[in-house]
Amino acid sequence: MSLTEEIKKRRTFAIISHPDAGKTTITEQLLYFGGEIREAGTVKGKKSGTFAKSDWMDIEKQRGISVTSSVMQFDYAGKRVNILDTPGHEDFSEDTYRTLMAVDAAVMVVDSAKGIEAQTKKLFEVVKHRNIPVFTFINKLDRDGREPLELLEELEEVLGIASYPMNWPIGMGRAFEGLYDLHNKRLELYKGDERFASIEDGDQLFANNPFYEQVKEDIELLQEAGNDFSEQAILDGDLTPVFFGSALTNFGVQTFLDTFLEFAPEPHGHKTTEGNVIDPLAKDFSGFVFKIQANMDPKHRDRIAFVRIVSGEFERGMGVNLTRTGKGAKLSNVTQFMAESRENVTNAVAGDIIGVYDTGTYQVGDTLTVGKNKFEFEPLPTFTPEIFMKVSPKNVMKQKSFHKGIEQLVQEGAIQLYKNYQTGEYMLGAVGQLQFEVFKHRMEGEYNAEVVMTPMGKKTVRWISEDDLDQRMSSSRNILAKDRFDQPVFLFENDFALRWFADKYPDVTLEEKM
């Protein structure tokens, strides 16, 4: 198979949702159809002993939530599928946002009882900003939920995107009978031995079912007043195809997967800082690091840099340019993933995600090129933390483990590090409380370094240039610090302290990140 044909086979997407909408469960079912697991491990608490394949970190297994993005790959129906299962918890939006820079499409999972929730809306806005296609899976039809028409209306109003139902539920909860498949023009049956039936058989099958008449009325209404189906509108991110189903009972998931792969886009190009778009079919290899993860194998204390291949082909042992440093690197020890399990890979192509063993060479956002190519891809989003804690080792004899743990976890981008300019104290910044809990858990579990964490409360953060730096500007209400890149930064007690500082030092430029 030619390189072009291989690249065109790739389908790389992220699954996004609000916590508990069933995102990890649907990921499990997709892996099941891809032949990667024998049974889908439903998400359960710590007593059951059954854990989701994509939730590999101890704290994820204990809590039943995803706090880091998993990467999984399988072959299905002539396509090579790369799934990125993202954290649903709002504290981990930074990791999720970066992950969304590495995909060509998104699958949005919605709880049929709750509709569009806060985190779903937040993540959708990022996807919309990138104009990537969104496919919607309305989940949990095995439970009682809201009316399908009401859910479609909310989706369009809240998210500002047109929708087109690919199927329609026949009943819900205990009265759930199946799906009226508009795209494949058939019925998918929830009960009984037969999986499918023709539309013509519907009247006989559901002769005594009051829901079926309502279904036919709803479909007639949608055909008269609903949006037209347009493959181009889907690819442009203007229309979301909507699928109903139940991930827990594995109903409607395979039909979704088949149809998704029919319409999901091939790998797309990425913009450089100079505004050029690198074509995925270009011969020369290029890619970018969108995530760094330490201790995927705690026994080996390893670090993996996740790279999205943008163009060309990776071959084991190839040399690359690291544009940020101007130095070269050799890609000899490279893996692909199934959550925590992995295998060495000798070649991969545009659209694929590879893991490069990292000894401290790479940073999130790094561009890799070959030959004379020295361009950089557009920077990944960074976020200003809102809450802070001082951190120190509980045992001074564990200083080495403490520093190694902090260095690796900060390089992952899971938490941000600041150092007090005058005292040298370490301060951690996060967008939510859960990040601190995960940091503490991982420091103790992965690095055997107990930590003392002292809350500092909320802070307003602004960066300044080295030229404007004057240590006399620091006070109890505005702490002068350095970030992990040694850039000077002020942590203001509140907005009032920020305004007071700006009035007192009008010539100092204060910079805000995202």
Curated annotation (Swiss-Prot):
Keywords associated with the record: Cytoplasm, GTP-binding, Nucleotide-binding, Protein biosynthesis
Superkingdom: Bacteria
Sequence ranges assigned to domain tr-type G in this UniProt record: 8-268
InterPro entries: EF-G-like_DII (IPR053905), EFG_III/V (IPR035647), G_TR_CS (IPR031157), P-loop_NTPase (IPR027417), PrfC (IPR004548), RF3_C (IPR032090), RF3_dom_3_sf (IPR038467), RF3_GTP-bd (IPR041732)
Annotated compartments: Cytoplasm
A cellular component term, taken from the record's GO annotations: cytosol
Family: Belongs to the TRAFAC class translation factor GTPase superfamily. Classic translation factor GTPase family. PrfC subfamily.
Protein's name in the database: Peptide chain release factor 3
Annotated source species: Streptococcus pyogenes serotype M6 (strain ATCC BAA-946 / MGAS10394)
